[in-house]
A protein has these predicted regions:
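Short, conserved clusters of charged catalytic residues that mark active-site
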Residues: 3, 79, 175
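Nucleotide phosphate-binding/pyrophosphate-handling subdomain across enzymes
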Residues: 15-20, 28-38, 42-47, 56, ...
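Residue-level signal for alpha-helix termini/capping positions
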Residues: 9-10, 89, 172, 208
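Glycine-rich phosphate-binding loop used to anchor ATP phosphates in small-molecule kinases
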Residues: 2-25
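Aromatic/hydrophobic pocket-lining residues that form π-stacking "cages" and hydrophobic walls in ligand
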Residues: 4, 84, 219
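Generic hydrophobic alpha-helical segments
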Residues: 4-8, 61, 203, 207
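Acidic, Mg2+-coordinating active-site environments of NTP-dependent enzymes
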Residues: 11-19, 39-125, 139-161
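Phosphate- and divalent-cation-binding pockets in alpha/beta enzyme and binding domains
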Residues: 25, 80-83, 199-202
Length: 223
């Protein structure tokens, strides 16, 4: 982590996206003061370190909320929302719950040949190359974060063209892999990094929605 921070500083990056390794409160990335914090979702994972309930895990995740720094919450449950809200109030940090109806940036999305076509509040039609219905929730979070970054007191300039390009070519630009990634078509082979209950709750309906020409016994999953 220290070497990464040093490299970012030497390269004079415009924005460094720092991903927390485990939890948040005690993670080594938490030494920085960001311009925006994002908590995507909470699930039962690494319970031996973070706690046995969603509320306990949310408390660890909420440790990244810094005084006065805006925070976007992608998804929440009845257990986790009060935890995030309380921490944000303590830190006097503006908080936005991206999945609340009033904050939703995406009205709907339809599958297309090369990903998803989103109908969005601020940018109209956006083409995203990542597959999976669960990407709608991710897109809500992303666009809400971009809105905050571009409209805060000292706004960061991000052109609409850059947003469209980033969404449409995310794999090429970032090297992101393993998000409902099609390895081949015949037979259909999918690679996805879903590794916990929450991940499989998203993957299961996606798998079920795929057209299948063979009897069910010919459909295989490899874990």
């Amino acid at each position: 982590t220290a070497l990464a921070f040093k490299y970012f500083a030497e390269q004079k990056v415009d924005i460094a996206v720092i991903e927390v390794g485990l939890g948040g409160r005690l993670d080594c990335t938490n030494i920085i003061t960001p311009i925006l914090s994002i908590i995507t979702n909470i699930s039962l994972d690494h319970t031996q370190f973070l706690g046995n309930t969603l509320a306990e895990i949310a408390g660890e995740k909420a440790g990244i909320i810094k005084k006065g720094v805006p925070v976007v919450i992608g998804e929440y449950t009845s257990e986790t929302k009060p935890v995030f809200r309380k921490k944000a109030q303590e830190m006097q940090s503006p908080i936005v719950f991206a999945s609340d109806y009033k904050n939703q940036e995406v009205s709907f999305a339809i599958p297309i040949e090369n990903g998803l076509e989103y109908n969005t509040k601020r940018y109209g039609r956006l083409i995203g190359e990542l597959y999976g219905e669960y990407q709608v929730m991710n897109m809500n979070t992303i666009l809400q974060a971009v809105h905050i970054l571009t409209t805060k007191a000292a706004p960061i300039k991000i052109s609409e063209e850059s947003i469209r390009k980033g969404v449409k070519h995310v794999t090429e630009l970032t090297g992101l892999m393993g998000r409902w990634q099609k390895i081949q078509e015949h037979p259909l082979v999918i690679c996805d990094t879903g590794h916990n209950v929450a991940g499989w709750e998203c993957l299961a309906p996606q798998i079920k929605s795929q057209p299948c020409q063979q009897p069910v016994s010919y459909t295989h999953l490899t874990l």
